[in-house]
């Protein structure tokens, strides 16, 4: 029997079959669910018909935790307010964007279903937005969902909350996919195609991935580094390591997809973007043809985007912040490699565009 959890939020009576959650329901290990900080939660009861719709919690950048076994889950969120419009953003641990500013008119109630991947036996859902609401939450195991595994570096990874607004494009990809697909982001900061394998990270994916899943592979930023644990030669060892990812996926009937490295933000004097990856990009393109692996040329797509924005405006995509602009960077930050959240959203959209253009089927069917 499929395990499921059903929660009714607010201060009215609980709906049949649902567990009641109020603004006083704090997380306790023995309980296994609750808000991690109830000071950021209020509750209202509009005293209208329908026990799920009449009352709600208002989570002002608040997180709700449910202890669950590792695996894939479909979550369905009910949102609405009888008398006020609402607008809610939902992220899953850590910082994976599931939906953004979901607007619901006053008197309406909507359900939004999304898929999540849990690795640490805890599902943490963070609600924010201009006027957030949560009326109901259903969590159901989804063992038959398609997994989209990501292997890559810091430009792809789920960046930690204490680095906000740092974000990898893999964090933003879930909002672009229907609930049939779960994004399993195994990308890790500082890794090259070589060190990712030598640390056992590819093996961890191979142990999980199944037939008809996908493995997206983006390396190159750190393969250029000269230290022995990470460096690969672009025409030889770089290709050899990338082949291991492709072979690992194909061995179980999964589908590998190569992604060229997203560009850094460095411009020539003539306004053209400087290519800091050089032969690594061409090697990925060559390998795609040699092994008949679908290719998303994110390097070319990001080049066009950055050049269109120009040297100054493109800063808005990257971690460029004045002193005091970002809470975790009081002295400011100037980073031409890593994205802030809005930039990662734009790059994830380019990846989704690449899925369509490369006719990666049936994955392309599940794009929103």
Where are each of the predicted segments found?
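Alpha-helical cap/lid subdomain in secreted, periplasmic
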Residues: 201-345, 349-368
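Short, solvent-exposed polar/charged micro-motifs at secondary-structure junctions
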Residues: 16-19, 193-197, 306-308
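Conserved beta-strand scaffold positions in the cores of enzyme catalytic domains, especially
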Residues: 6, 183-185, 292-295
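Compositionally biased, intrinsically disordered or flexible polar/acidic segments
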Residues: 1-161, 167-170, 329, 338
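Short, structured coil segments at secondary-structure junctions
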Residues: 92-94, 179, 252, 291
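Residue-level detector of flexible, active-site-proximal loop/helix-junction positions
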Residues: 104, 155, 190, 263, ...
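Conserved SGNH/GDSL esterase-like catalytic core that processes O-acyl groups on lipids
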Residues: 130, 140, 144-150, 155-247
